[in-house]
Amino acid sequence: KRGYVVANLEYRLGWNPAAATQALKGASLMKAVYRAIQDTKSAVRFFRKDYENGNTYGIDTSKIILSGQGSGGWVALGYATVNKYEEITLPKFLDVDATTGAVTPLIDTTEIGDWDGYGGAMNMVNTPGYSNDVHMVCSMGGGIGDLSWLEAGEIPMCAVHCPTDPVAIYTTGNVSVPSAGLITTEISGSYDVMEKANLLGNNDVLWAVNAGSDPYTLAAQAASGTAVGKSDGVFDNGQG
């Protein structure tokens, strides 16, 4: 009726905030987000396959947008930006044994597969052979593992975020949960993500759409006028 189709996707859950060490907590969280990215890409491939076989859901494969809230926001941003091995093996994503000095990636692609859900001894590939490209992502209260993941030429993105969120940081810093303490360090929230995406020119295409003068954007910008910082494309929502 409204001209678009919405799919509410499910993905694998499971991370352990009560793990014995910070490294294990961080690894658990990273693996959970990584698996969710794989599952979401599998879902996009499923819909593209269905499109070629009758299009049961009536989708337009030229206009696929991924949106998520909280953990789903992390998935959306990771979906758009993680596309090479070097990005998931940055020094902060490595576990160094205190006794032997052995270095182990927190994400072992030989075990759980790559970011598209291919390969891996313990991974089952779903709907191979179809594209899992999307055309835009929206994060609500999410974040990104490292700002270096963002590169010129990647898809547009927007974000909604509470500047004073006590768990999901708005700028760049640590992730901590009241019941578990520090989980991982130096991640970036919506403000810094959108600032870099805009600087790279990835969102330039959005300015041709109502040129930022639609009533929703104007209302969000007005509401954000007294917030802690503001970057085009990130809309600050109050917390209450």
What kind of region is each of these model predictions?
Residues 1, 5-34, 217-220:
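Cap/lid segment of the alpha/beta-hydrolase catalytic domain
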Residues 23-38, 42-70, 85-91, 103-109:
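Gly/Ser-rich "nucleophile elbow"/oxyanion-hole loop immediately N-terminal to the catalytic nucleophile
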Residues 5-10, 63-67, 75-77, 135-140, ...:
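Structural recognition of the beta-strand scaffold that forms the well-ordered cores
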Residues 71, 75-79, 148:
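Hydrolases whose catalytic domains are alpha/beta-hydrolase-1, hotdog thioesterase
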Residues 98-205:
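The feature captures the conserved acid-bearing segment of alpha/beta-hydrolase catalytic domains
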Residues 53-64, 149, 204-213:
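Surface-exposed patches in mature extracellular/periplasmic domains of secreted proteins
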Residues 198-240:
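C-terminal catalytic histidine-bearing segment of alpha/beta-hydrolase fold enzymes
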Residues 45-53, 80-85, 142, 198-202:
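Sec-exported extracytoplasmic/periplasmic mature domains
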